[in-house]
Curated annotation (Swiss-Prot):
Source organism phylogeny: Eukaryota, Metazoa, Ecdysozoa, Nematoda, Chromadorea
Annotated SMART domains: FN3, IG, IGc2
Name of this protein: Netrin receptor unc-40
Classification via Gene3D superfamilies: Immunoglobulins
CDD domains: FN3, Ig
Amino acid sequence: MILRHFGFILIILTVYLSSTHATTRKHHRRSIDNDARNLGFQFVMEPRRNVTVMESSSHLLECSYVLAHERLVHDVRIEWKRDGVLLSERTSSRIKVMSNGSLWIESVSSAEEGTYQCAVHVTTKSDQTSDTWTFLSRKATLRLADLAKFELQAIDRTLAKGQPTAFHCLINSKPTPTAVWLHNDEPIVNGGEYHILPVSNTLEISSTQSRHEGTYRCTVEGAGKRRSSQTARLTVTTETVSNELVFITTPRLQVVEQGDEFLLECLVASLIRPQVRWLKDSRQIIVDGVRIRRVGVSSILVSRASIEDTGLYTCRASNNDDSIDRAVSVEVRAPPRITTRPTTKVAVETADVELECGTAAARPEARVNWYKNGEAIIGSEYFVIEPNRLRILGVVRADQAIYQCIAENDVGSEQASAQLLVDAPDSSSVAASSGVPMTSSAPLGLRSTSSGSRFINVEWDPPVQRNGNIMRYHIFYKDNLIDRERMINSSSTSATLTSLQPSTMYLIRVTAENEAGMGKFSDSLKVTTNKEQAVPGKVASLTTTATGPETIDIRWSPPSGGQPALRYKIFYSHDPLEKNEKETLITTSTTHYTLHGMDKYTGYQIRIEAEGSNGSGLSSDTVKVRTQSDEPSAPPVNIQAEADSSTSVRVSWDEPEEESVNGEITGYRLKYKTKARGAKGNTLVIDATAREYTMGNLEPNTQYLIRMAVVNHNGTGPFSDWVSIDTPGQDKEERTLGAPREIRPHAGIDYILVSWLPPADEQNLVRGYQIGWGLSVPDTETIRVTASTTQYKIARLHSERDYVISLRAFNNLGSGFPIYETVRTLSRETPSHFNEDSDSDDSDVGSSESTPVGVRAEAISATSIRVMWTESDETAFNTQYTVRYSTAVDGNQHRYVNSTETWATVEGLRPATEYEFAVRAVASNGQLSTWSMATRNRTLAAPPSSAPRDLTVLPAESGDPHSSSLHWQPPKYSNGEIEEYLVFYTDRASLADKDWTINYVAGDKLSHQVSNLLPKANYFFKIQARNEKGHGPFSSVVGYTPSGGAILSGKDRHNARGHGSAASGDTVSLVDQLQSLLHSNPLYLILLAAFALILILTLILIIMCCWKRSSGGGRKNGYQSGKKTSAGAGSGGGIGGLGGPPNDLWINGTGSHMRAGASDYMVDGLATAHLTAADIESPTPRYHHLQGQGTLTRSYHQSSQSLEGRQRTPQVVYTGTGRHQPIQRIDFESPYGSSSAIGSASTPPLPMQAPPSGPPTVIDGYRTLRGTPPNSSAANALRSFTQLAGATPPPPHSAASSSSRPTIIAAGGRQVPVGRATAQPRVNVANIYSPFASCSASSDAGESDKKSGECMEMRETTPIKSNTAGSSNGEKMNTNMNPSHSAEDLNAHLENLDTMLDDLQQLQHNLHFETSMDK
């Protein structure tokens, strides 16, 4: 038992010692840092890359180094090469190698020009071997300085006074020569009016004057030489210069080296000095004044150029009218720079070694060459040269050397080196205590399982004696005719040898490795690869050149080896490769081909295969190329304009699709103008990085048209359609915003579509909206949108969750009040709300049929939408589909379309209408699937199919007779958003539509004012609507004749509108028509004068008859006329104050239908009061008249001077009580707004009698009211009078009633007391509606000696005063006046007068008709 334990411990100790010894062996291996063979070579000084020296001068090319380990160094030798040829001091006495390795050249001549390189040879010796290591420096180019010829010289110039100009003096030489300018052979001093630009030596004059005329030339000195330019003459004229932009100098194409400076010239002439900006690759250059500074008038100088300065530079000059661009490319060339250097390595024979050499970006692109001990390496089967990498396969002892990568281009070169040390395979092994080796035995049974022309598969069995764990197997193989052996590793007992040569015998052997190292080798296996069919090799010298925006030229050379090529296959695709894109194949038999129809400014990758009789050979390397740029082919998209204030508009847009830009965007061109005909447009050029721009200094209350185009280096693309925007008349205020008026959410499974209406206060400025949402709480997430946005889709939500949505508007004062809405997203089992309907066919829905997925709708036209979907069941057969669609316009009424394909076209839709679609599958057995998720889309717009409605023409609100106001309603079928209305008008209806005058009105306006109309001329109006697709039909023509009267005041216009004086839009007043008719027909003037004379005589006759009857003493039971007093103090009671009894005919001698002067307010026993139009504003009638009270209806048009167009005065209503009444008061504070609603507050209405329905509304030429005596019936009233409808009945006669003061109710805010009223009032409407109404009152005959009447007169602000003279005069008249014998006589006269007025009205209609016919 003890022995067994002892044996176990011994075994463990043996294994531990073995592993310790193996570890010790590994640790004793030499480190590269401590290896004496590692020289640690490094160049301290290398020759400069490019050197320019003066002829016959001396120059030193430096070359010095250091060695980290010199113990084994035996000798160091330095050599110089010129253009790859070794230099010797023996062949040239002017060349000498210094002790530190530098090269000294004396008296440099053209023979010494070339490329120089230093080579350092280091020889080391050890006990066994001697090795030579060679290091190469970078290359240096030596050139002689020279003064080249002029590239640009001064030319004659003639220009206007005050314009800038420039003269060139360009020589491209190094070093840069010095220049001197001469004006009339006198030197010019730089500064002030003259600017001599650096680098190019251009002379600029910022503002030419007469003193600048003369000759100009420059003299240049450099490289020991001197040159003079040609002489140019400057002529200054006094001609007027246009505002057109013209380039004087433009930037030129330049290639500069890193670290140098370059000048970009740009000088532009115009009437007004333009603004000049510089852009680099569409971004504006910031002139910092240090590295980039402005020189001259508008040129820029860039110092210390770097690769980042390479690009396209654009000089952009602009003024208010236009802008011009001139672009030029600048290439900054830089020498290569090695970023990843190869490292010194120690390798074991048969191993593979990789050396990396990575370079940074260089212009032009650097070439990397590999050198072994100063000799160029040519790629082979064992030296594989890859980009930035060198692979050495199967390292042998001869591969030990210095490996260098040298990157070089036309500017310079850079080198990096590494030392490769090669050791023999490690043969040491670990022996056990018995002396038996611990490595494994040889693997057994090595065999080949398969082989081809380029590969061999081998297998073997593990060794019998493993002596530990087998860590890996090493497979060695080599060409039977070559000593270089290669090795690969495998962790299993099989391997595949690749990259072999066809028809070649290979020797293969295997060994196993355990903890002690590699074991014994197996016996070698000989395997011969198969013969390969002869195919062409790779094509050589593949080059691609973009010859245009859509063409690429491809050229190559035939393959150098293999079978001859019969044809070539060209493969090309986009770079980078688009999704699911495949290469395009073109076959050709020539070694060049031109691709046509390529995308503009698009990258492509191209490769070529040569094809022989046995198939295609290896593909060439892929070459990338980009087609040339071109002018943009599309304008910006999503252009929106929004008024920021009354003088500024903010425009926003998105860049077009990338494939339509055709280059790099350098800016956006924005044109804007007013909508007025012949308006001059303005042009702005905006930076390419901008997505919005604010235009300022605009006119308030003006409509502007805006359109945009994309600008690139090739020019300006097409402009967009005009976008209209109206600036407000006044700036909106920024106050705290109210909540949006409405929020309408629409929920889906994982989204919520939110739409809203803006706040109600349109005068409050809204700068945007903030939308917030969250699960059960608002504002967990928020986003802000612009003020013009009224819809937003909230995506990436969870299904079947309650979300609280908040919406608030904001401006500079902050966020306004929010509005909230709670919405629940849909369930995934309920794809859309279509499943919630109650259609009968939904009852048959089964679950066995799969639901269509991926439903999408694509608008085809204005009346059709194509619906497409994907069948989710790939095994479905003979399936039919039902498409259901609806729109909110029809109340979401469902309609259906059937299809047997996975698409359907729905026809007969409304233009510009959003529809919702869902699809379900119908199996052959009749089973139905559930409805798919709903999708929405909108049909395309179409021109309006109906005209604007209800076109109405009214007088202008301002009262201007030269203007009219048009009102209309939108078309019933607009077929899209109305962009504008076209108002056509003319004074000749027979003209063609193109000859009518057109006014353009924004689509959101429904009214427009037309100005500059001629009074009394017939105008015809019609209107047309336009949307984005075109114009709609015309509305019906509406005629209108502007009046020629004076401009009415605000109150008069209100009265005129209220009584139809101009409301019809196609009529004029009677007076205007008569005036027009009389001017054109003198005969009518004679007839009218005769008629007026007859009318006057008739009136005189009637007055005389009435006077005789009243003075002759009539019957006692006759009609008792009321007494009245003249309106004016001291005037008589007759017509015109002549003293006779006043007439009661309501017609004066001026031809008006109602008296315009001071008239009677005929109430017995009352004094007279005057009311002016300025005192009382005419109220809108609130009560209606009753035709049943004997109202005589008159229907004819009124002039602007008629009584109906004048200011109303309060009406007096009497209570019907005793003759003695308290003084009435006019209540201007009454809410009734009418002077006809009269009565005491204490007077109750009659039982079962409706309240007053309104005053007698005057819609005719005149209307008269007269009270009815208490003892007479209403039916016995005169035809020319009417009893006040619904009059308040008389209250009981008592002290209370006698002490109450009746009130006249009117608007105006004052209570005016008037005279007393009798129980039988007689009211004359001529007085009520006269601007100077009078009221008179006289006491009864029995009371004439006790109390006299008072006459009150109202003026603008003067209180009513009693008219004593008028009162006494009235009493005298009352004493002398006899009562009328009969009321029937007066009625007869009045009936005759009514007949005459009817005849006058008929005459007026006849005259109007004849006038219309003449026109």
